[in-house]
Amino acid sequence: MVKAKYDIEQIKQLVKTYWRYKNTEFRKCIIRAIEYIDKEDNVDLDLIEILADYALNDPDPKEELWEIDAGSGTPYYGGDPLTCGINTVRGSATERLVIHGYETQYPEKIFKILNKISEDKSIAVRCCLIKFLQGMIKWDRSKTYNLFMKITSDKHPQVIKYGLECLYYLITKNNFKSFIPHLERAMILEENLDYHSVGKYMGQILLLFYLRNYPRSKELLEKGFKTSEEIKLGAIDFASRHLVNPDPKIINKSKKIYMRFLNEGTDKINQQYDCCFNNFKVEDFNKIYALILEYSKTKMIKKYCETFFEFLAKVVNLEPDKCINLMQNYKNFEKPDIRYNALQGKLVQILIEAYNRVIDDTYKEMAMNIFDAILQEGVYKGEAIKILAEQDRG
């Protein structure tokens, strides 16, 4: 009936008539029907009570199925408690109540129900409860904070992992210390959250708290760096996005973190630094030029150069002299290799464009000297001749 988009009032009446039927799959259908009603209309108190009854009293789940081997050493639901939870009655009803809480007309009622659900011993159900809990902050920050602390009272790492977004919105300078145990548990997780590793996400939020001068945030960030390379990756990424900022203190701290790992040289860190050029804006080039120049002198650029070149291709028309300065370090750059990268001709194109744009004869001569030098290297010679021939043809 939901798929056929029947009349909302008819669907409501059917839900209220048959919701007590005790069948797991049927009850999941009831929850989906209430979800449809919630999206198309208002969920009234009767429907909220139905969800509450399911979330608090239904026997499903009976066990943590996500921890059980489904065969061949792979646990059910890939070992993910949230995916497991939303495929159970209590978990699905809980998730629907929390999502409804974003726009509910009955926030006090929702808080009361969620507070009872927080006592559920099921990790899967509590993951469903905490995943979207941040939506309740707008109704009452203090109640949401207390609810978060209750849900995570056992500091289970999976529950904390799915509560990281809510944690991010709840943390202030005054309550930061109360979240340190949660952050320390999350730091050791070697798994993904959505599209990124938990460690990378942690690196970003730990650096944010450090930039905001939260008490003990520097100590926690340093602990994170010792714990996980992924935390370093997240911090590098976050720092690169704050190298230009209205607050000079934030700029200085971001620069120090950005520069800190330039010579560490692991494959992941090398790749992360190249990816940082996706965060840079052309109009900010002069503000971060000194950092880019230092980067161009490091050994790490030998392995990953593609995004670096793409950024220079965007700025060369505006700052050809600075691009020529950077090209002087070409021996450090990743070499073109059709088997592994798409760098063919990029360095040569940037250099020729810089030469054509620059006015100062000193820089023109510098560009020619670099060009003569790269022609001595086979990996560049063929591409250089090809590009020059194309320019001659007009």
Regions found by a protein language model. Give the residues of each.
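Non-catalytic all-alpha helical scaffold/repeat segments
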Residues: M1-G394
